[in-house]
């Protein structure tokens, strides 16, 4: 049994989530086309502080993440500090844990508060699928380096003559695991086949996600956590996620062809998250400091856990490994939760994890536990829709989930909630939140 996690300061103060905000999430090459992740990160942090009328000089630490990193700005956190009016001496560093990046950022800030190093910090993440670090071939890179050292024109011409047309082709960022060459979509297909997840079940979950997200927006439940963004060159604005299918029918999902296994596959563009641009941030502080500043927290971080498993098979099963650890560390069980929010990278991955939560066999063989984690009550599950509908700017999703979950938990009168996500590299994250 995992030990209880005491996420309080020496004085017994909890880690408060005081505020959370995100940009609208936009499909690749749409509203944020040409806008770097860094700009979106600065945009959302600045807006969050302005909405609170919060002095940026009070921020003592920023931990931010970016999965698709740009070489010209490798430390996005520090650039956000420099671009938002914070004190020049504010500590800032960047993290990456693939799709669980902003959960890691939140955990790091929480640990700094617990240790007494800081009282106030910002965690979050931003990613752009529209502004990508397009590279060059290894041969061209080596030749360019040699050219910079060549002293004569004849040597330069000789080096250039060794290049072929293929060597000059741009190299886009990899979409597959470095160690295996397997993509996320291929893993989702494998999980669907291995765990008996049908095409109909996947399409039904995607339809549910979009329907619930559309209703949440229509009912005004999301408006308060999403800013209006005016991306350069400031000719247009966006104030709402543009991936949500507001008027789709379940039948329309069945029309799409499989994306990763054309002949026998069940994973399609409609039951997968799209490439997305966006940023999200949360403001964390010591509970007592929030009271001193007259700020009412959205809620508190009760526990968290991270997991790692093999990447050859079931690579996206991280929630099923991280969740029981987080529950144990919080001293609660699945049945104690008011809400469960699981990142929907793919409908297949989500449903496979839901299935494993209720599997005693999985718990015994993979978790070393005698009983299953627990059957998920779908009335508590992704009640406002999930990533299939909102989209998934990799590093921003965790912060979106934390803010969205705590706000909904408050509307329901408080209680405990689970946020959990799979991530590339066989990683997983789970966080238990509480609100009053």
UniProtKB/Swiss-Prot annotation:
The EC number(s) this enzyme carries: 2.3.1.16
Cell location: Cytoplasm
A GO CC annotation given for this chain: cytosol
The keyword Transferase is assigned to this record: yes
Catalytic reaction equation(s): an acyl-CoA + acetyl-CoA = a 3-oxoacyl-CoA + CoA
Residues forming the catalytic site: 99 (acyl-thioester intermediate), 392 (proton acceptor), 422 (proton acceptor)
The entry's keywords: Acyltransferase, Cytoplasm, Fatty acid metabolism, Lipid degradation, Lipid metabolism, Transferase
Protein name from the UniProt record: 3-ketoacyl-CoA thiolase
InterPro entries (UniProt xref): 3-ketoacyl-CoA_Thiolase, Ac-CoA_C-AcTrfase_FadI, Thiolase, Thiolase-like, Thiolase_C, Thiolase_CS, Thiolase_N
Annotated signal peptide: none
């Amino acid at each position: 049994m995992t030990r209880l996690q005491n996420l309080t300061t020496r004085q017994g103060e909890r880690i408060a989530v005081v505020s959370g905000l995100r940009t609208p999430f936009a499909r690749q090459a749409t509203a944020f086309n040409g806008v770097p992740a860094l700009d979106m990160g600065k945009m959302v942090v600045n807006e969050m502080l302005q909405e609170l009328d919060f002095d940026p000089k009070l921020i003592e630490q920023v931990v931010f993440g970016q999965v698709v990193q740009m070489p010209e700005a490798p430390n996005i956190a520090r650039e956000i500090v420099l671009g938002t009016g914070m004190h020049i001496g504010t500590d800032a560093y960047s993290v990456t844990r693939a799709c669980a990046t902003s959960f890691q950022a939140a955990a790091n800030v929480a640990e700094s508060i617990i240790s007494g190093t800081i009282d106030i910090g910002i965690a979050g993440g931003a990613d752009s699928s529209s502004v990508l670090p397009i590279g060059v071939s290894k041969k061209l890179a080596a030749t360019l380096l040699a050219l910079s050292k060549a002293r004569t024109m004849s040597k330069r011409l000789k080096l250039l003559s060794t290049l072929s047309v293929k060597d000059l082709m741009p190299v886009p960022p990899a979409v597959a695991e470095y160690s295996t060459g397997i993509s996320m979509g291929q893993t989702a297909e494998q999980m669907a086949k291995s765990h008996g997840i049908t095409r109909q079940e996947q399409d039904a979950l995607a339809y549910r996600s979009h329907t619930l997200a559309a209703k949440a927006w229509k009912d005004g439940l999301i408006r308060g956590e999403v800013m209006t963004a005016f991306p350069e060159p400031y000719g247009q604005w966006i104030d709402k996620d543009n991936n949500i299918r507001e008027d789709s029918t379940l039948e329309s999902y069945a029309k799409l062809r499989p994306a990763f296994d054309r002949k026998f596959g069940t994973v399609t563009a409609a039951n997968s998250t799209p490439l997305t641009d966006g940023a999200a941030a949360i403001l964390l502080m010591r509970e007592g400091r929030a009271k001193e500043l007259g700020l009412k927290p959205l809620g508190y971080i009760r526990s968290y856990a991270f997991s790692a498993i093999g990447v050859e098979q079931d690579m996206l099963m991280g929630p099923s490994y991280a969740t029981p650890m987080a529950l144990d560390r919080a001293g609660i069980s699945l049945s104690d939760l008011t809400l469960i929010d699981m990142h929907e990278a793919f409908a297949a991955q989500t449903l496979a994890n839901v299935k494993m939560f209720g599997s005693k066999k999985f718990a015994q063989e993979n978790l070393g536990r005698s009983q299953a984690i627990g059957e998920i009550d779908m009335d508590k599950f992704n009640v406002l829709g999930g990533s299939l509908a909102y989209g998934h700017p990799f590093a921003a999703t965790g912060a979106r989930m934390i803010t969205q979950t705590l706000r909904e938990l408050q509307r329901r009168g408080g209680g405990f909630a689970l946020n959990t996500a799979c991530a590339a590299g066989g990683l997983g994250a789970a966080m238990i939140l509480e609100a009053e």
